[in-house]
Amino acid sequence: MNNILVINGPNLNLLGKREPDIYGNITLENINQKIKLHFKNEDLKIHFFQSNEEGKIIDKIIESEKKYNAIVINPAAYSHYSIAILDAMRSINIPVVEVHLSNIYKREEYRKKSVTAEASLGVISGFGYYGYIMAIEFILNNLVREK
């Protein structure tokens, strides 16, 4: 069985309440349920982790190499400046795909740069919760099922 870790960064626990004009009314729990439902027939276990604390995210990334086949990460605001998360992502030997709910290139200038993208296989941005599904499909089709 394949194990994929989905990491969500700061303030994503506020989805459904925070800036619904940008993120919609869907909650993080709803997103997690939709992801699980989409992959219910796969030989796949999806694990979810959310933290508002940079250090906890770093610890989770570092320990993930021994437990998971890949990571899907939405570093949220940390994507724009966290060299520490970037370094943690570079230190592991499993694939990482970065996801953003909103199109970061249509947002404020400071949101248009993702430093963590440098350690990601790719970045999916602007497709809402479906970006997570796209990332997992990519992982399964290109990295896991091929083996």
Curated annotation (Swiss-Prot):
One of its GO terms (molecular function) is 3-dehydroquinate dehydratase activity. GO terms for biological process: amino acid biosynthetic process; aromatic amino acid family biosynthetic process; chorismate biosynthetic process; quinate catabolic process. Substrate binds at residues 74, 80, 87, 101-102, 111. Signal peptide: none annotated. Pathway: Metabolic intermediate biosynthesis; chorismate biosynthesis; chorismate from D-erythrose 4-phosphate and phosphoenolpyruvate: step 3/7. Keywords: Amino-acid biosynthesis, Aromatic amino acid biosynthesis, Lyase. InterPro entries: DHquinase_II (IPR001874), DHquinase_II_CS (IPR018509), DHquinase_II_sf (IPR036441). The active site is at residues 23, 100. The record marks 18 as: Transition state stabilizer. Its EC number is 4.2.1.10. It is an enzyme of class 4 (lyase). It comes from the Bacteria. It catalyses: 3-dehydroquinate = 3-dehydroshikimate + H2O. Belongs to the type-II 3-dehydroquinase family. Homododecamer. HAMAP family: AroQ (MF_00169). Catalyzes a trans-dehydration via an enolate intermediate. This is 3-dehydroquinate dehydratase. It comes from Clostridium botulinum (strain Okra / Type B1). The gene is aroQ.
